[in-house]
Amino acid sequence: MIEKVVVFNAPPGSGKDEACKWLINKTFTYDVGDTRYSESCHHKEFKGKLFAITREIFSVSKDEWDEHYTRELKEVAWDKLNGLSPRQALIFVSEDIIKPNFSKTYFGESLAKSLYQGINIISDGGFDEEMLPVIEAVGKENILVVKIKRDGCSFEGDSRSFLNTDKLGIMETWVDNNSTLEVFFTNVVEAVEGWLNLEK
């Protein structure tokens, strides 16, 4: 069995989380040489480790965190985070504590160690450095970056950006999300199926 990685790389509000939830319910069939694989998808996030560390630093339980890390509240200041919003707290821990003191690849290393056999769907790509351990773990040929276009969505005010796939040497595809969810999901599935069945 092979580890495959599909990384969604898109601005907030563009539909990447919805696409990942849709793919988790899918099974993909593809051939490698003379072997046919039928794989389900597993959801992974670079920020999984970051969430755990941030909760620990601010002494916040998982239940408390989950109550506040919602679309409505994640931008709202919270006294348990010393007046930071949950999103600001994540950026503070990542950019001011972990990366300067450990490595810019820290969260990528953590994710690479936790990959499943089969198809891993990563919903929060946005830093080139975090991709390096993943590339080392599975190989460039086993990674697809899905970038999403949606009107009105940008990385403005976000520490993430579009991955430099040319520099990283990995494949990318663009999917438009300016129509219905049905069309969007169909395009995402076709993009992943097309990549899985490419001659490698």
Predicted regions and their residues:
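Extreme N-terminal starter segment of soluble prokaryotic enzymes
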Residues: 2-6, 41
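Hydrophobic anchor at the beta1->P-loop junction of P-loop NTPases
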Residues: 8, 122
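Small-molecule kinase domains that catalyze NTP-dependent phosphoryl transfer to phosphate-bearing small molecules
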Residues: 9-12, 105, 110, 115-116, ...
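Conserved lysine of the Walker
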Residues: 16
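Hydrophobic positions on the alpha1 helix immediately C-terminal to the Walker A/P-loop
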Residues: 19
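Post-Walker A helix-loop "phosphate-sensing" segment adjacent to the P-loop in P-loop NTPases
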Residues: 25-42
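ATP-dependent small-molecule kinase phosphotransfer cores
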Residues: 37-41, 46-120
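Short, well-ordered beta-to-alpha junction loops that form the rim of enzyme active sites
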Residues: 124-127
